[in-house]
Amino acid sequence: AYLSAACQKFEELYGIQVDYQRLSTGEVYTKIEEEAGSPSADVWFGGTTDPYNEAVAAGLLEPYDAMNASHLISDTYKDADGNWYGIYKGILGFMVNTEELDRLGLDAPQDWDDLIKPEYKGLVGISNPSTAGTAKLVINTMVQMKGHDEAMEYFKALDKNVYQYTKSGSGPSKMVGPGECVIAVGFLHDGITQILSGYDNIELIIPSSGTSYEIGATAIFKGCKHENAAKLWIEYALSPECVNIAKENESYQFLVIDNAEQPEEATQFGLDPDNVIDYDFEDAKEHTAQYVEDFFEAVTNGSAENADSSRFLTE
């Protein structure tokens, strides 16, 4: 809903027609990689920066010195070379179905290591790192918190408890309220959307030992066909005209633009916690693709292509 509303507002403000396609961030990266410098789209809007950083490393984004970047609350929320700019922050955590946990006589997990306890076997929903940027962020987060080898052992143990790896990062949040999974791993603002849609059986949990965050970003594709319109989009995306309509369309992320109206829900549900790690974006830029390969080697003894398609969804 937010993507559609943002495009409509851009058309109203500038008289430029916008065609858009909603894909997970991993799918966007795969698409622009295949298009190899002749992209079918001009800009990328939304989604975690881990796939953006992969695209930077592959030379697929066009740097731009955006004037409205002066309104970012910190330089943390932009690429040092202007390849992408952040518009919101999303906190990684757990969403749990309290009714199902009560029925099963289980306590809610409070930290990452709780997720691998045997009593949660088959109860966890998480996204597929071959398609979802959210899952790539989870992988990078565990590598940065635990070290590479321990992180891969962790994912091997976690896999025993995972019911399904969804195509999109928001997928698990949509499963937890109806009870399709009992514990969802993803961005907590997606959980807020579900709670406010009527699922009052969902509880949000920020991992006690620390967590990380996404920077939801926007960027210009290298070789795009409408460069001036693309630059205008970046300025627009970094403005209140764009970000203030997020909350009107069930998107409750913590905004990182100083002249924006912060959604009350983001503050109410604690989406600016004080225990986030000092996320290493440079490491993510250099190594995400390798870490994803290592993840599949750990949990499937092979590649993403060999993964069980009934659990690792790509559609």
Which residues does each predicted region cover?
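Short, well-structured alpha-helical segments in soluble
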Residues: 30-37
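Mature extracytoplasmic/periplasmic domains
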Residues: 216, 221-278
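Periplasmic-binding protein-like
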Residues: 90, 154-159, 165, 199-222
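Short, polar/charged alpha-helical segment
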Residues: 1-17, 94, 194
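A ligand-binding cleft/hinge motif common to bilobed small-molecule-binding domains
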Residues: 50-54, 177, 182-201
